[in-house]
Each structure stands twice: as C-alpha cells, then as structure tokens.
Amino acid sequence: MEETQQELTQQLKELETLMAAINLDDSKKKQPIYQNSSESEESETENKNFIYDFSSEEDFEEPVKVKIEEEAETSNKRKFDKNPEFTRFKYQKIPKEYVPAHQTTSTIGVLDIDCVANTEKIIKEWFNHHSILITINEELKNLSSLDTFYYLVYKTRGIAHAYLSNLPSEVLSRIPADRKQVDDWVYNLLLREFVGRLERPESEEAFSQNNYYKLINLEICNMCYLENFLCEFQSRYYGINPIDRENLKVDLLLYAKLPEYVRTQVEAYFNASITSNKLDNTLGGRITALKLWQTEQCNQKLAKRQASVGLCCSKIEDKIGKYGCRKSNPRAKKPKKKFRKIKKYPKKNFWKWNNQRKKKTFRKKRPFRKQQTCPTGKKKCQCWLCHEEGHYANECPKKDNKKAQTLKLIFDLGFEPVESDIETDEELFELTSEDSSEDEY
C-alpha cells in the first residue's frame, strides 16, 4: 500500500509539472513566482530594459529581445542647444530632420531634397552628374529608355523617390523613346514638381524678374562683408536672362551698390584699366578691379590707418607678406601672472520678510511745544482742586485731606458729634436742637 501511494504521488507531481509547462490559454500568461522581493525587483528592471523587435510581415516569428543600454548622465541639466529657434517666443526644440540645410556635393550620386533650402541647385548638379554617366558609361549605353528611367529613380530617395516611383501611367506613357532624352525629361519633371518652373518662356521670364528685383534691393554698407556681397550678387546676376542683362546693363549695379567713398575711386580705377587693356568689361573684370584697388589702398603707407578702418584690410586674402618685419616693443609687454581661476559662489542674503501693508502710516507734523497753562512761568495760576491762587494742583496742601473735607460738610449740614454716653438705641436716633427743651420730648 505504501509503495502504491508513493507511485501515485510521483505521478501527480509529474502531471503538475507537465500542466505548468503547457500553456492552455495564450492570452493569459502567468508571471513567475519569486522567492524573495529582491529577485522580483531585479527581473522587473531587466524586463523594462528589453523591447520586442519583429516585423509585421512575419506573423509566426518569435519576438527577439534587444537590450537597450542607457547612457550614464553626469547631471540633470538640459543639454545646450547651439541653434535655438524663436528666441522671442517660448523655447521649442526642432528635430534635426526638419531643419532646412544646404546640402554639399558629397552626396551628388543620390538625389535627396528632403528639408533642403537650395533645391534647384541640387537637382541641377544631380542632373549634370548622371547625364554624363549615361552618355559615357558602357553599361548604361545599352539600357532602354524605360530602364534608364528606373535607373534614375534608383538614384533618388526621400520625397523625390516617392514622387518618381508613384507616377501615374499617363505620365509614364510620355517617356521619350530616345534614351538620351530621358534624363532631360526626368529633370524637367523634378523642377516642375519641387521648384514650380515650367519649360515655357513665361516661366523663365518670371524667375528672371525675381532675381533682378532681389539684385536691385541688395545693399552693402560695410566693406568687411565684401565677399558675401559679391557671392550673392553673382548668384542673382547669372539667374537673369542674358538678353535682359545686356538691355538693363545689370553689371553697372555692382559699383552703384558700394559705399560712396569707394564708388568713385573704383570706377576711375576700372576705366583706367580698360583703356590700358588690362581687364575686360565683364562682371569678373569689375570684381577683379575692385579687389586690386582694395589691396593697393591697404598697402599705401599714407592712407594705411584710414584704409584699415574703412576698407577692412584685415580680411583681404591676397596680401603681400611681411615676414619678420614687425618690431617688438618690450615696454608694451607686461608680465602676466599665472593664476588659477577660483569660482566664487556669492552668499545669499536672507532678508526677513516684512509686510509693508501692516505698517501704520503717520503723517509728519511740524514740531512745536505744548502750550503751558502758565506761560509766564510764575505761580499766579489758580489751583484746580482748591481754586486758590499761589500754587499748582500737584502742590496743593488740601489734595490728600479728604477726611477733613467730609467732616466740614457734616458740620455745615448741622450735625454734631455725640460726646455723652448712649444708654439705649433710641438715644442714638434722637434729634436735638438749641431751641428745644426737655419737656417737649
């Protein structure tokens, strides 16, 4: 009997372990039971540091745990942002992917114009790069027009890739049969969609007038910003239609924008260089004449002090070197003490809180002496107690004689003290007078 009971208990234990291993209900997951509270807390912190990473396409794939390691923070202070936006308003940090930026030519092979400020320039550089590849590369020469289109789509990403890969069938049917014209067709599509430019003279004229308007309003007041001024002037100048540039004589605006003390001298220098056949009458010749005149003015010894202030000679790139010519002035050099800067934290002054509302306010009065009862200072005033002259009330001799006053009042009323012995109570209330006699009683 005992052996059978032991076998039954072993079988029951095995069944319990099997039932615990099998999940009868997938929706209800049992949490593990921990012996100590410390083990449970450690497991909870580990589970928080794990995330499940799996794709929605693979439904039957088990989730993979990926541990996230948190970076140790030295302080609780917020990190400094170099480019805070809208300083006049409430601070709001903008994600980097949504901040407009000027893209460089390092990623010219793939077109990416997401949140880019110079969209037209990037599309133009990308078009020039791939138009040469399509004509030179032997492998790309054998592609059809449709394959060339898909190759150009492959070389894009972001919003440009989303636009070209989702073109309707009506637009795709207009792909030119000649593979050499596919890149021009794609380039015009991108300009029309992301810049708004059309292949029509009206559109070109509108963009030309916009550049001319910006060029007219361009100004420079400080010669230290000459390079920035010339860079923007050139970009606006070559954005204007060549016919309009000649008719409007836009190149003359370069010297007209300069400050007054520079304009007349630079024009005279440029005209002299043209007559001597040193420079050509182009925009590049005018810029070169301006820079040459600036260097000559800065190198003159007489006007050196004036030129260094007005022409910003310190920022000239093409300078004449003077190596080892600067004389040292020992008097100007002062020995500097090397010391370690110690941060001083100012002590906070704890002021006692004082509520000014609770204070009573008093008007300022003119100081004066209190009027005396006897202004002469002599004792001729009447006493308040006895109504007699010759002394004050505080010196009155009758001030403390209250008993004498009461006795006087009693005698004035006709009462006299009883001197004889009283034998009975009736004698106490007996009234006597001088005129009365003993027979009347």
From Swiss-Prot:
Keywords annotated in UniProt: Capsid protein, Host nucleus, Metal-binding, T=7 icosahedral capsid protein, Viral penetration into host nucleus, Virion, Virus entry into host cell, Zinc, Zinc-finger
UniProt region (Disordered), positions on chain: 26-63
Please give the Gene Ontology molecular function terms for this protein: nucleic acid binding; structural molecule activity; zinc ion binding
Q: Which GO terms describe its biological process?
A: symbiont entry into host cell; viral penetration into host nucleus
**In which residues does the motif Nuclear localization signal occur?**
77-79
Q: Where in the cell is it found?
A: Virion; Host nucleus
Zn-finger region bounds: CCHC-type: 381-398
Which SUPFAM superfamilies does the record match to this protein? Retrovirus zinc finger-like domains (SSF57756)
Cite the InterPro entries for this sequence. Answer: Caulimo_coat, Znf_CCHC, Znf_CCHC_sf
Look up the record and report any one GO term of the cellular component aspect.
T=7 icosahedral viral capsid
Which Pfam families does the entry link to? Caulimovir_coat_dom
User: How is the subunit organization of this protein annotated in UniProt?
Assistant: Interacts (via nuclear localization signal) with host importin alpha.
The record describes the protein's role as: Self assembles to form an icosahedral capsid, about 50 nm in diameter, nm, composed of 420 subunits of the viral capsid protein. The capsid encapsulates the genomic dsDNA. Following virus entry into host cell, provides nuclear import of the viral genome. Virus particles do not enter the nucleus, but dock at the nuclear membrane through the interaction with host importins.
Q: Which family does it belong to?
A: Belongs to the caulimoviridae capsid protein family.
For this entry, the protein name equals Capsid protein
**Which classification does the entry list for the species?**
Viruses, Riboviria, Pararnavirae, Artverviricota, Revtraviricetes
